[in-house]
A protein has these predicted regions:
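Extreme N-terminal, non-catalytic leader segments
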Residues: 2-15, 19-22, 26-27, 41-61
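Hydrophobic anchor at the beta1->P-loop junction of P-loop NTPases
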Residues: 65
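P-loop (Walker A) phosphate-binding loop of NTP-binding proteins
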Residues: 68
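Conserved lysine of the Walker
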Residues: 73
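Hydrophobic positions on the alpha1 helix immediately C-terminal to the Walker A/P-loop
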Residues: 76, 80
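Conserved substrate/cofactor phosphate-moiety recognition/catalytic segment
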Residues: 82-126, 153-154
Length: 275
């Protein structure tokens, strides 16, 4: 098992390096592969990596992109989705908007005291599905996780007095059972650290129907919880190393940050101490 895991990690590392050779990024010393072969080699390495994974029972890497509403998670996922060896899973928002004809997300924003528990129960279910579905690539990048659903959004409802303690306890019991009995582990959290003010401006510009009534106070509360959880690490146990990327900048600078951190993001096995 250990031998297969080590081989898997090495192959993933080479896949990431080869994928970069056609870009302006510097090549590793002695690494001279014609650009025309890059894509073929990446596909070959990915195929071999998956084969090693299946034969040796190795677990592939799961990277979760975390951050406030409108912090830039979709932009991050879209950027790395261009990498051949990555499976990208966005938040299942469409499911939350249409549960057999019911828009749970919209109902929650309209009356969180009434619909908070209903939405968060369904979110926990759909995020569990995201974590446990079979992996089709060596790397899976997820938009948020079952961990942030509980530690950020459920916690916010409870702290703000919009979720009764009994509902909070039931969701906590479910979450603890899930984490003990299913594999929802994470190898790396990429935290897009963004000010509530920036998120609020982006929120207004993207004009999503359900988000029109989101107040600055809500974004500030979510930001505070993320800071407690991932930066101060005083809220709940953090399930993996954390890589912090400042995401208040304009689009071009943020993309430059992604490129600067590409190797650290795509080889999470090497991330021992990110903070």
């Amino acid at each position: 098992m250990e031998r297969g895991s080590a081989l898997l990690k090495r192959m993933l590392w080479w896949g990431v390096r080869i994928g970069r050779c056609g870009s302006s990024s510097p090549k590793p010393a002695g690494f001279g592969i014609p650009q025309v072969l890059n894509q073929t080699l990446v596909i070959l390495i990915v195929t071999l990596t998956i084969t090693v994974h299946m034969r040796h029972g190795c677990r592939c890497a799961v990277i979760c992109v975390e951050g406030n509403i409108a912090s830039g998670k979709t932009t991050c996922l879209d950027y790395f989705a261009k990498t051949s060896s990555i499976e990208v899973l966005t938040e299942p928002v469409l499911k939350w908007r249409n549960v057999r004809g019911h828009n749970l997300l919209g109902l929650m924003y309209q009356d969180s005291s009434r619909w908070g528990i209903t939405l968060q129960t369904y979110i926990q279910l759909t995020m569990l599905d995201q974590h446990t579905r079979p992996m089709i690539s060596p790397l899976r990048m997820m938009e948020r996780s079952i961990h942030s659903a509980k530690h950020i959004f459920v916690e916010n409802l409870y702290r703000s007095g919009k979720m009764p303690e009994v509902d909070y306890v039931v969701l906590t019991e479910w979450f603890e059972w899930i984490t003990k009995n299913t594999n929802v582990s994470v190898d790396l959290i990429v935290y897009l650290q963004t000010s509530p003010e920036t998120c609020y401006e982006r929120l207004k510009n993207r004009c999503r129907e359900e988000e029109k009534i989101i107040a600055m106070e809500y974004l500030e509360a979510i930001h505070q919880l993320y800071e407690e959880w991932l930066i101060k690490q005083t809220l709940f146990k953090v399930p993996s190393p954390v890589l912090v990327i400042q995401a208040d900048n304009d689009m071009q600078k943020i993309i430059e940050k992604y490129e600067e951190n590409r190797d650290r993001i795509l080889t999470p096995y090497n991330m021992q101490h990110c903070l």
